[in-house]
């Protein structure tokens, strides 16, 4: 379910990214993830809620990829796209590692994942807000 929803969400985000502001779409995706995660931990866990969570979160998970790549290319151009997106991708992997590692440490300390979920929700809300001031215009390059 998550994988199928990922494909649909990524294709939809790419389509919408051609027509609407990428920063607002990214903000909306991060806010959507935050709302979905909050609902998931606030409501009773049932097979139906897990299926809904999987589909909803799956549709938003990789939807950031085409929008982020498009935003980097639009602002900085294609000349350094590989390097810049490599930095973005590396930082994402670093955050993934830290999230899993710290999540395990917090589980060892507290005996459950509640704090990890709430930190993730806070990071999602921060991500939604931090995209809003992005200026979606190309940076002009001045040759010395």
Residue ranges and their predicted role:
Residues 10-22, 107-108:
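Helix-to-loop junctions at the C-terminal end of transmembrane segments
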Residues 32-45:
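C-terminal ends and interior cores of transmembrane alpha-helices
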Residues 49-63:
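Hydrophobic core of transmembrane alpha-helices in multi-pass small-molecule transporters
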Residues 68, 121-144:
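Multi-pass alpha-helical transporter architecture, strongest
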Residues 78-87:
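Loop-to-transmembrane helix entry/capping segments in MFS-fold secondary transporters
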Residues 105-123:
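A membrane-interface helix-boundary motif in multi-pass transporters
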